[in-house]
Amino acid sequence: MSTSGALSLSYKTYGDPHLPPLILLMGLGTPSVAWPRPFIDMLVQRGLYVVTPDNRDAGASPAGKGLVTSRELFFSIMRYVLGGRVTAPYTLTDMADDVLLLMDTLGIRRAHVAGVSLGGMIAQCVALKAQHRTLSLTCLSTASGNPRTGLGKMKALKAILTPPDAQTDPREHLKKTMQAVGTPGETYDDDFVTAVLKAAAQQKNPQAGVRRQVMALLAEGNRTAKLRQLFVPTLVIHGESDPLLPVAAGKEIAAAVRGSTFVGIPGMGHDIPKMHWKKIADAVARHCYDAARETRL
């Protein structure tokens, strides 16, 4: 299994490295510091060794190569929606290779892999490419790549792809973006927002990286048929009020992967809100340990 084109990702670890490893993959253009630290601590308290890498083109990880113009991105989205093939500087499978290289670097032979949004798509590609190294898969607020459900609703997609203008406070712009797709009533404190912006600013051209990541999503295509051949214990968690990726996208993954478990959370949007940290941490940790028991049988 080759990962010759993989990039070395920046990462942080939490907990005891002798415990079962859980790799958490963040979403589109977002640095790993966006994983709420109290949520990570809950996973550590439940006996997991948590690894949070920055995906390529995010945070402190290397930037990808290739320029994608806004015009090219627009026409690529149209081609994808119509069922056409898209070429890109890299694919989600290439991003999965980055994760496998990180596992090699950390000496992790097998890991539980979880991801939110785009990170959940990368996690699927890790499992599809390296089932023998994937102890379990957790898909949070994500999709299978089916153009009918997996691109996102245009209004919400526009909100996350539109950069702030010169007159807009970046902190207020980020808050409004998160509120546009997140759980109604969820708040984001200034320290958290500042930390995310500071980490994102480590990329010389964050918007160029976001466009490359979207192109990677488009180029990967529809994974539904491949997911039907997946034999990795899979948990799908999806907000029932997700304004970006409809809950049907999560149900579609669960329907494709045999033996998977679907957990819909009423009122939750496209985020991991404070009010559901414990519920999600409990579900993820339980899934990891159930999967480990199944593997030993």
Where are these regions (language model features)?
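Catalytic active-site module of serine/aspartate enzymes centered on a nucleophile-bearing elbow/loop
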Residues: S260-L297
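Acidic catalytic loop of the alpha/beta-hydrolase fold
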Residues: S241-L245
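Conserved acidic catalytic loop of the alpha/beta-hydrolase fold
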Residues: T93-R110
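Flexible "cap/lid" loop of the alpha/beta hydrolase fold
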Residues: L137-A166
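Conserved HGGG/HGGXW glycine-rich cap/lid loop of the alpha/beta-hydrolase fold
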Residues: L7-Y80
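Conserved hydrolase catalytic core segment
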Residues: R109-R148
